[in-house]
């Protein structure tokens, strides 16, 4: 029984490690990193979120699922805190939490607010490729 449990644990770890290799790069918003991603003409997602936001919580598993697809391995995801990064929100013309903005390099390709549907979020992310 112990051997089976160990095998299952190692298998799960291996699968998580492999899946993590395909996942998009998530990090808190940093101006220099954002500009570097733009200069490299990478696909970018800005995820404006708040810890108290139920829509943001609903978006999270959808985004995790979609960005784990190998097609998005180069996608840079920057999390923007709605409550504390107000100057940045003004610059980006964001008025609400749960806003998603996609770029391909320096070109904004699309945005949505309050969307939790996997199909439409997938279509939005695809615009960054």
Can you annotate each of these PLM segments?
Residues 101-129:
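Non-catalytic, surface beta->alpha helical segment in thiol-disulfide oxidoreductase systems
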Residues 26-42:
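A short beta-strand-turn-helix
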Residues 39-51:
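Short active-site neighborhood of thiol/selenol oxidoreductases, capturing the structured segment around
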Residues 1-9:
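Bacterial N-terminal signal peptides that target proteins for export
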Residues 48, 67, 72-86:
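Thiol-based oxidoreductase modules, predominantly thioredoxin-like and allied folds used
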Residues 43, 92-101:
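Structural micro-motif
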Residues 9-18:
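Bacterial N-terminal signal peptides
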Residues 57-71:
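Typically the conserved alpha-helix immediately C-terminal to a functionally engaged Cys/Sec
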């Amino acid at each position: 029984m112990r051997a089976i449990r160990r095998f299952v644990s190692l298998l799960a770890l291996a699968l998580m490690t492999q899946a993590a290799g395909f996942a998009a790069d998530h990090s808190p918003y940093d101006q220099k990193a954002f500009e570097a991603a733009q200069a490299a003409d990478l696909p970018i997602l800005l995820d404006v979120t708040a810890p108290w936001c139920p829509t943001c919580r609903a978006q999270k598993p959808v985004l995790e699922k979609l960005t784990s697809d190998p097609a998005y391995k180069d996608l840079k995801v920057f999390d923007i805190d709605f409550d504390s990064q107000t100057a940045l929100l003004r610059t980006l013309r964001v008025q609400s939490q749960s806003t998603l903005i996609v770029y391909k390099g320096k070109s904004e390709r699309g945005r949505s607010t309050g969307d939790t549907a996997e199909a439409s979020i997938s279509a939005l992310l695809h615009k960054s490729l």
